[in-house]
Swiss-Prot record:
One of its GO terms (molecular function) is protein-lysine N-methyltransferase activity. This is Uncharacterized protein R08D7.4. InterPro entries: Methyltransf_16 (IPR019410), SAM-dependent_MTases_sf (IPR029063). It comes from Caenorhabditis elegans. It comes from the Eukaryota. It holds the Pfam family Methyltransf_16. GO terms for cellular component: protein-containing complex.
Length: 371
């Protein structure tokens, strides 16, 4: 059996489901029953994808067009609330993406004999006159969708300067979303292979916590510093006595790791999109083994792109005497745990042409389990 003090994720997901059911039943004056997943408005869903420069799902685009057909003012309101919204116009959200969305929407509206507002054409014209830089921004919104939760610069190209660490990837977005369920009592977080810093910085913004972001490439470390500043997080050189919303950047080479420099305790270790290079997995698991001496658990998120890399990762975890306490998947806005599915829509949307779930691992030393 497991130690009752073992850190677990699955009960948090299940309890969130129960909370939604209980809240809905209270609203309906019922004591029992089921509840459908809380659904955002079509416009807010569209706004989330647009601000994060994530491809608009086909069904969502159809829903938007349908709304425009039903309501003659919907297209104008959409333009005001999304395309010309200050959140959008004040950030360098990928211009090519915005142009493509507007062109597709205008084409669909015209095909359905919907009057396209002048403001939509004007915005398209403005975007076509803008030049993309080497870096673009992704913007993620609060639960209400009216404010910016976190924003990140990333390289225009997924492979830039010889590294993939300058781009945002799926598992980092899904890991950030998972932490909406994790209590803020875990206020010291260490992230391995931070890349753009989506997971760690978003966690620092959502919770009252201090996050240490680590990577090795100099260009990636510089981008992390930029994204910390972009999100108004305190660095370790500033006074953090008022609150713990703080993020710092440190260089950490998995292949040349000096544990004596990392003896400060952390509550949780996190990592996303780090299980892709099998040549580095033994070193990664060694680092996890050492760091877990002073941490409750490590949460690793990865996409199922290559089954052999997943198997290799699990093999090296076993060799490092680390236990997979929990393993589950997230896809299409739902966690799959055994035969059960728990809907929990993401506020960190991400689109990939490769449709694959994100796998979550809760990793702990074997001696933390009592049999």
């Amino acid at each position: 059996m497991q130690d009752p003090n073992t850190f677990l994720l699955i009960p948090l997901i299940q309890s969130e489901r129960k909370r939604k059911i209980f809240t809905k039943c209270q609203e309906n004056g019922e004591l029992s029953g089921m509840v459908h997943s809380e659904k955002e408005t079509t416009e807010l869903q569209f706004k989330r994808f647009y601000c994060s420069a994530s491809k608009i799902p086909d069904q969502l685009m159809k829903d938007i067009v349908e709304q425009c057909i039903k309501d003659s003012e919907y297209a104008e309101n959409l333009c005001n609330n999304v395309f010309n919204n200050e959140i959008v116009t004040s950030h360098e959200i990928r211009y090519k993406f915005q142009i493509n969305v507007l062109k597709n929407l205008i084409s669909e509206l015209q095909a359905n004999n919907v009057v396209v507002p002048d403001s939509m054409f004007d915005r398209l014209g403005s975007l076509m006159g803008m030049k993309e830089g080497e870096y673009v921004e992704r913007v993620y919104l609060t639960d209400g969708g009216d404010k910016v939760l976190a924003k990140f610069s990333e390289a225009v190209n997924q492979l830039s300067m010889g590294t993939t660490g300058l781009s945002v990837w799926q598992a980092s977005c899904d890991l950030a979303n998972l932490f909406r369920l994790i209590p803020s009592e875990y206020n010291r977080i260490l992230e391995l292979g931070s890349g753009c810093g989506v997971s760690g910085i978003a966690i620092a913004k959502m919770n009252d916590c201090c996050v240490t972001l680590t990577d090795y490439d100099d260009n990636v470390l510089n981008l992390l510093e930029e994204n910390i500043a972009k999100n108004d997080l305190k660095s370790d050189t500033e006074d953090s006595s008022a609150n713990n919303n703080q993020a710092t950047v440190r260089s950490l080479n998995w292949c040349d790791f000096d544990f004596s420099e990392w003896k400060e305790p952390t509550d949780l270790i996190i990592a996303a999109d780090v299980v892709y290079d099998t040549a580095l997995l033994a070193s990664l698991c060694n680092v996890l083994n050492l760091l877990l001496r002073h941490s409750k658990a490590a949460i690793v998120a990865c996409t199922r792109r290559n089954e052999s890399s997943i198997e290799c990762f699990e093999h090296h975890l076993k060799m490092a005497k680390l236990e997979i306490v929990e393993k589950f998947e997230y896809e299409n806005g739902a966690y799959t745990i055994g035969e059960n599915s728990y809907h929990y829509a993401s506020i960190f949307p991400f689109f990939s042409t490769l449709k694959t779930p994100t796998i979550f691992y809760n990793i702990q030393p074997k001696n933390k389990l009592v049999f």
